[in-house]
């Protein structure tokens, strides 16, 4: 398989990296991350005008990319810049609506690409422990529509989204893949309560309570009780995005550390000349390349289906979780005490790498999932 980027992708990467380097400095990013909104609407609009959100979707959805490698190119650059704007949720929600949305819902994808709408993925629940099928929020029929009740946790930009993609159970038990439905819910709908709070790595998330939220019948995304497959497909693209973002962040942490080792002196020489530190940096470099390979493999597999797709995605998420923690720890230790300070950008990259591990399943979850998928493959079960 040829993993070389096309000219169009290289141009996209160059444009985005240049834009972030010139317009998204660490100082401006830090100010934005600590703002009441946790992101910049103006910067979000500028990213959209540059076509970055459009690169996440295919032409049928109003974009011009949508391949796993298009997504990886974008998110690797976003990881290098520690971008806090809501790209991940735009990707996941947009994928779900493009796949299963009705004619009234698909225009939301176009609005996100244009920058006129912000969407949030409201799926995780307290106690779900990363299990995608663990949904306790309930949707019951009422008249010609639906009524939703439940609680969603750690919803990215949940305070400021225009629309929430909410998973709710319409039948079956709490852990069943069958019986899960998806709904497009206006954030300002009656019965929706949002409690926002700040993340340790910058930006904001929210806990969203749904109490007797009445929805029209056309709020249902796809078919009743058949939302899990749409959910799994969309989250798969999110895993590719997180893997690529982590690689971008790791690259910058490595660059900061190498620069410090070249300039920090002890006993009259740069500490980078000490053999023990050289060996540690060599291990970091090898680890990052392993993470990059796993991310590339996930980007290549995400457009497929079945167990092999899911194994590649879980392998990538496990790898970037384990390696991201190692890169963060080694980079801080090689910097000494200064590596922990707020003023040094490195500490923010370290926090982001730790948080990436906990999004859409941590390394322990995905290692266990990878093993279970392998067992299923050996038993001849071809479904994920």
Model-inferred region functions:
Residues 1-85, 100, 115-116, 141-146, ...:
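Alpha-helical interface subdomain recognition
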Residues 83-103:
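N-terminal glycine-rich flavin-associated loop
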Residues 98-101, 140, 166-169, 184-186, ...:
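Short beta-strand-to-turn element immediately C-terminal to the catalytic PLP-Schiff-base lysine
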Residues 99-118:
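A generic, well-ordered mixed alpha/beta core segment in the N-terminal half of proteins
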Residues 115-124, 166:
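A short, Trp-centered hydrophobic/proline-enriched beta-strand micro-motif
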Residues 130, 134-137, 185-216, 223:
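Flexible, small-/acidic-enriched active-site or ligand-binding loops
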Residues 131-149:
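Cytochrome P450 C-terminal beta-domain/meander region
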Residues 149-193:
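A short core secondary-structure module
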């Amino acid at each position: 398989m040829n993993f070389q980027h096309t000219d169009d992708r290289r141009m996209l990467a160059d444009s985005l990296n240049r834009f972030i380097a010139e317009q998204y400095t660490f100082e401006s990013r830090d100010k934005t991350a600590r703002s009441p909104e946790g992101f910049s609407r103006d910067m979000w609009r500028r990213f959209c005008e540059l076509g970055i959100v459009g690169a996440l979707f295919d032409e049928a959805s109003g974009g011009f990319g949508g391949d796993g490698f298009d997504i990886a190119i974008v998110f690797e650059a976003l990881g290098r810049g520690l971008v806090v704007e809501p790209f991940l949720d735009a990707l996941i929600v947009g994928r779900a609506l493009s796949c299963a949305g009705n004619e009234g819902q698909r225009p939301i994808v176009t609005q996100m690409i244009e920058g006129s709408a912000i969407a949030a993925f409201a799926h995780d629940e307290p106690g779900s422990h990363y299990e995608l099928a663990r949904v306790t929020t309930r949707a019951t029929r009422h008249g010609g529509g639906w009524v939703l009740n439940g609680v969603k946790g750690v919803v990215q930009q949940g305070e400021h989204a225009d629309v929430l993609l909410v998973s709710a159970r319409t039948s079956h038990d709490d852990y069943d893949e069958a019986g899960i439905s998806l709904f497009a819910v206006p954030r300002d709908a009656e019965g929706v309560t949002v409690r926002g709070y700040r993340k340790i790595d910058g930006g904001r998330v929210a806990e969203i309570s749904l109490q007797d939220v009445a929805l029209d019948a056309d709020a249902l995304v796809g078919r009743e009780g058949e939302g899990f497959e749409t959910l799994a497909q969309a989250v798969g693209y999110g895993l590719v995005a997180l893997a690529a973002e982590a690689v971008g962040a790791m690259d910058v942490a490595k660059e900061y550390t190498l620069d410090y080792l070249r300039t920090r002196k002890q006993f009259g020489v740069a500490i980078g000349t000490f053999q023990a530190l050289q060996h540690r940096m060599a291990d970091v470099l090898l680890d990052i390349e392993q993470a990059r390979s796993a991310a590339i493999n996930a980007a290549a597999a995400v457009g497929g289906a079945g167990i092999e797709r899911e194994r590649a995605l879980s392998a990538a998420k496990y790898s970037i979780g384990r390696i991201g923690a190692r890169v963060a720890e080694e980079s801080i230790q090689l910097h000494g005490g200064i590596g922990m300070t707020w003023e040094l950008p490195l500490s923010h990259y370290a926090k982001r790498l730790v948080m990436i591990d906990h999004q859409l399943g941590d390394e322990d979850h995905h290692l266990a999932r990878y093993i279970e998928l392998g067992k299923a493959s050996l038993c001849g079960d071809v479904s994920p």
